[in-house]
Amino acid sequence: MTVATYAAMGSEPNPSAFSSYAERRGCRVAYPCMLSATEAAACGQRMCMRAVAAGDASAAPFIAHPTRAFAATDIDSSRFPIVPAEALDMIVVPLVAFDRAGARLGYGGGCYDRYLSILSPTCQIIGIAFDEQRVDHVPTDAHDLPLPNIVSA
């Protein structure tokens, strides 16, 4: 099984316990890596997922600097290979706010909206949040995808 998660920034819910559990269960765990403008233009995505072996997260520059864009030459692709979107079985998604309809407000870059649209239909998509992030209504545009699953506490 291959799962994608993220390294929490600021006050985001921290999925590191989930990541550790997935690794112990033998799952391949991947993290988002922002792409340079040149590579984003070439593949139509601003973000990819890269596999990170258990215990190797501290060496992954895209985990230490999640908002920085990296060129392919900046990353050791044999150590941190790109995981094709269609290979993901599950993805854990951060969010700023959400509503009862599953609408998600992110940080405004549209990276996850674009990425979620290319996942396999069988991929489980799970947003995680604090209860305080629930709002009555999240304004959406045509490209915004609702999350089928949101877990909050």
What spans do the regions from the language model cover?
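Surface-exposed, charge/polar-rich loops and edge strands
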Residues: 77-82, 86-91, 99-103, 113-153
